[in-house]
Amino acid sequence: MNDRVTRLLLGALGALMFAGMLSQQAGPGGQGADVTFIKDDQTATIDCNRNAVSITGDDNKITVKGECTRLTVIGDDNEVKADNVNEVSVTGDDNKVAVNTVATISVKGDDNKIGWKKGAGGKKPEVSNIGDDNDITQD
């Protein structure tokens, strides 16, 4: 191989290794990598550890423990219970999400039920509701 091709390949390999290291770095909360869960018909417990959690699938029963920067639920008929979340985003139909403390709630879909106990900082959460028959209430 000539020197130019070798340098290009080594440069590309170095860039890929650097990108891989970045993807393993701490998430926005600084504690570890964000969590992505992509499955159907599962029961699971996820440790948030001050990062973002994304749940994609249908008919899951998920418990999210600890503080989260963001909780994203995409799919239908999921049941999610979470401790403390800065931002909850739900896209789909017939999901049930219960959160202890939350600052922002965004819902896109129909027939979702989002319950929260406390707003962050003692304030009611900001709510965006796009869809029909969504129930977003304080428990």
Spans of model-derived segments:
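Bacterial N-terminal signal peptides
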Residues: 11-20
